[in-house]
Amino acid sequence: MYNKVIAIGRLVAKPELVKTATDKHVARLSLAVNRRFKNASGEREADFISVVVWGKLAETLVSYASKGSLMSIDGELRTRKYDKDGQVHYVTEVLCQSFQLLESRAQRAMRENNVTNDLVDLVLEEDTLPF
């Protein structure tokens, strides 16, 4: 049997580092991953994947990632259950074993400042052209 998850998407929110009762660091995050097809309205839908990151990997992720960061994750699919008010709840999430940020610092800064590479907004008059 083989349990492997690879996903590429954007962080829904900035991940937060939490320390457990046993002094271990954990970060929980949601990764928005676009589907390969468009719906009947012509829009692309996304799945929101729950991801858990432990230890030094969690510390590193929290230090460098922010809301909207494009990243890939590699891990295993896990299902856990817990009891709340007498009802058993099941949670399926990805246990992240590695990640990679897929945008440069410059791309991240442009995204965070809402700057795009869209040349449509750029208007040059003939007098300003160097030729």
Curated annotation (Swiss-Prot):
Highest taxon of the lineage: Bacteria
GO process annotations (BP): DNA replication
InterPro entries recorded: NA-bd_OB-fold, Primosome_PriB/ssb, ssDNA-bd
Entry's Gene Ontology cellular component terms: nucleoid
Location of the SSB domain: 1-103
The keyword DNA-binding appears for this protein: yes
Keywords of the record: DNA-binding
One MF annotation (Gene Ontology) recorded for this entry: single-stranded DNA binding
Oligomeric form and interacting partners: Homotetramer.
Record protein name field: Single-stranded DNA-binding protein 1
Organism of this sequence: Streptococcus pyogenes serotype M6 (strain ATCC BAA-946 / MGAS10394)
